[in-house]
Amino acid sequence: VGPENPGFRTSFPIVTTLVLSHPACLDHDTGPGHPERPGRLRAIAEALDHPRFARLRRMDAPGIDRAAVLRVHPADYVDAIEAAAPERGRVYLDPDTPMSAQSFTAIAHCVGGVVAAVDEVMRGGAKNAFVAMRPPGHHAGTASPMGFCFFNNAAIAARHAQAAHGAERVAILDFDVHHGNGTQEIFWSDASVLYASSHQMPLFPGTGGRDERGDHDTIVNAPLRAGDNGEIFREALETALLPRINAFHPDVIVISAGFDAHRRDPLGGLDLVEEDFAWATARLMEIAEKHAKGRIVSVLEGGYDLEGLARSAAAHVETLMGA
């Protein structure tokens, strides 16, 4: 995946793209054989350690912003997650979602990362940002961990943009192979946030049908079938999701950037390649330029084949850079 690949060319000027990470995210120990593992972040870091990414602005994520978390999750839930971390070994909050001694520190820095990303993008310190951190968040509901997720990072980003920076409308596009049931639940009755998702169905967690539209018609789902390729993915975005995001006139766009729809991924059955994620990123950049001064905050979700993840994240970031 090099700069000579015309598939990643965009018409955007060179922009300041911020990448946030923190070494504590490597210490969230999910145990042997768990797909949501520290090697995911190492693979992304290695992919971004290339001369063509020299222009990236990089930042270590700060610690938790509790006020930002409490805009999404109740205090007793936040306290319970913090208290659940064991002194040694692992505890399972559900069959897929273990915590180790250092897990809450990683979770806290994820929150700090999305808050800092929103702050920088909304203040103009960066045009857009990619939060390359774990654990992911889009399965976490208001008060429920699920599917590797504890706090909903994308939801925290959206609410922080509104509360701290005056954004009236936030659009979230989620292209993870799994439906972001937690994000959908959180914003089901919120007319100020549009949640748009492409995902495989049937597949975990089982939500995301076209008839799930929210109380204010601000939930838009475009389910795909196993085996669907990039052409079908792009058509779904062009016909079902992107027009709705454009018509919503968002003040900032949040991306739940899951790369497990890649054809190499062991947890999904779609047939996407990295160029498809680059294309989706470029289309969102066009909408962001039109309505949101180009402001995009992208938050890592899934992606469990290390090569597919690395190639996809690199294509995504290279597109964000306007390269």
Annotated model-derived regions:
Residues V1-F12:
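Intrinsic disorder/low-complexity segments
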Residues F12-A323:
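HDAC/HDAC-like amidohydrolase catalytic core signature
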